[in-house]
Amino acid sequence: MDLFYRLRSGKNNKLLYFVNSYAHEALWHGFYRSWRSILREARRRNDFAAIMSRVNYYCKAPGPQQGNTRAVRNFGRHEAASVYYFDLHKAMRPFGPDTQMRYLPGDVTTVPLLPTLTKSRPIKGDNANSVLLKLNAIRHFISVSDTTPFSAKKDAAVFRGKVMDKPKRMDFFNRWFGHPLCDAGDTSRAAGHPEWKTDFMTIAQQLGYKFILAIEGNDVSSNLKWIMNSRSVAMMPEPEYETWFMEGRLRAGEHYIRLNSDFSDFEEVMEYYLTHQAEAEAIAANARRYCEEFHDRRREYIISTLTVAKYLGLLDPADYQINS
């Protein structure tokens, strides 16, 4: 790993993010490319059908919807974390600051009554009113540099993260904390279970393990994306929530190793894959291929723009048509 990667613990650099975001915000008051121009660009691409498949996945609402809306310019930094503010404004830039919309920041685990732009939504059930955007991307989309072969990694699973007040993580710790096949630790400052408290571990250090636990917290597990981009394997129950990463499309045994929802089979699953490591390595390779879908920044911006355009078409069908 390079020195800069180690110094920032493998996470995205927030200073660079905010410098870039303020610069983009200033451009909004000058030049920005219109969404119709981006739509024309998309239609000229050979992968337009694949792009629209993702657009339709993120925005499932079937037809025009009425209800209260607000202009983009009226969503201020005081209403949510700055990263949500900047990511929203980046997505809305091709439409202008007076565009009317509905937006719900933060970790969203329920479905709004009306079509609304959100970061996350439940996977099961009717989730059409939750229209997904790539929000809080600096936390959830981390690129990792992992050159360590799977065979050279430690024969154990690892977890580092906040545990208290997160029921799924507490369930795992109550069952398996201290098990020899799992290096698990709670890095939160919350009171309770001092025996679970352990030292912080960088992403680079966690990548020294063959298996990394991706246990949902408030909504999705924020480490799942960088695990799947690495040569290690994600272990988790079937996900309950999804984001721009389309966790609902992940398949157990192909993209991640599935655990029971109560984690009762953790030891059994670990012992199986430690004696069938070629299968685990194949899952890691499949996961990396899945992640390649999200690596093309221009393509991702086109998909984001068309997702917003389709959503706005629900509110104002006359002005926003992407299928005509």
Question: Where on the chain are the PLM-derived regions?
Answer:
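C-terminal end-of-chain micro-motif
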Residues: 1, 323-324
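Secretory-pathway glycan-assembly enzymes, especially type II membrane glycosyltransferases
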Residues: 1-193
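Helix N-terminus capping/helix-initiation residues
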Residues: 24-28, 202, 219
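Extracellular/periplasmic catalytic domains that process cell-envelope and extracellular macromolecules
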Residues: 95-96, 148-153, 204-207, 228, ...
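Eukaryotic intrinsically disordered and solvent-exposed regulatory patches
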Residues: 143-144, 198-200, 221-222, 243
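Conserved active-site histidine-acidic residue motif and adjacent donor-binding/catalytic loop
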Residues: 190-204
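Catalytic binding pocket for nucleotide-activated donors in carbohydrate/polymer assembly enzymes
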Residues: 206-323
